[in-house]
A protein has these predicted regions:
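A cytosolic small-molecule/anion-sensing beta-strand core signal
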Residues: 39-40, 67
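Short, basic and Ser/Thr-rich N-terminal targeting/leader segments
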Residues: 29-33, 77-79
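Helix-adjacent hinge/juxtasegments
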Residues: 66-100, 104
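A short, polar/charged loop-to-alpha-helix boundary motif
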Residues: 53-63
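Short beta-strand scaffold segments in enzyme catalytic cores
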Residues: 33-39
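Zinc-dependent deaminase
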Residues: 1-25, 89-92, 96-191
Length: 191
């Protein structure tokens, strides 16, 4: 068997590879999150966020990397793999990591509002699940945080410069709150 390219304990190195993927997302004006999946000291999958490009809310870096890794190993089980991601996984991505039986998740910057690896909740080690992932947090945290902060500062500047009409209204697509009225017994919902 080939010797691993890099020592398995090199979280710093593999997070650097995830940061390279995040930089690709940044350049594409996607939220700059990158992920790599490592097995036996080798990167078997790499991905960056592609939500805007693919017009797919599930096209997070972690989801894309897990799918690639499963194809690379020829199995949906990733029991001997580590997922490296620049930002704490959301509930969807954490759930996918648990279902794929990823052994360990390593992330850069935490997300106290929506993170599911200990930030807002911890799906990776949820007590009632029979599968859990080991967690390593804070690897190259400052670099991961810095890229996200720069990205969102630039996005706010672009929106501000373009004026209030540029953002297409509320992101929910719902009418303004003053246009809502309660449903009555005779109202029907659009199908």
């Amino acid at each position: 068997m080939d010797e691993p390219i890099i020592d398995l304990q090199s979280d710093h190195y593999f997070m650097g590879e995830a940061l390279r993927q995040a930089a690709k997302a940044y350049e594409a004006e996607e939220v700059p999150v990158g992920a790599v999946v490592v097995r036996e000291g080798r990167i078997i999958a790499r991905a960056s966020n592609q939500v805007e490009l693919l017009k797919d809310a599930t096209a997070h870096a972690e989801m894309l990397a897990l799918t690639q890794a499963q194809a690379a190993v020829g199995d949906w089980r990733l029991t001997d793999c580590t997922l490296y991601v620049t930002k704490e996984p959301c509930p969807m991505c954490a759930g996918a990591a648990v279902h794929a039986r990823v052994a360990r998740v390593v992330f850069g910057v935490g997300d106290p509002k929506a993170g599911a690896a200990g930030g807002a909740l911890n799906l990776l080690q949820f007590p009632t699940l029979n599968l859990r992932c080991a967690i390593t947090a804070g690897v190259r945290e400052d670099e991961c945080r810095g890229m996200l902060r720069r990205f969102f500062a630039e996005q706010r500047q672009k929106t501000k410069a373009a004026g209030p009409e540029s953002n297409g209204g509320p992101r929910t697509g719902l009418p303004p709150a003053d246009e809502f009225r309660p449903l009555t017994g005779g109202d029907e919902l659009d199908a």
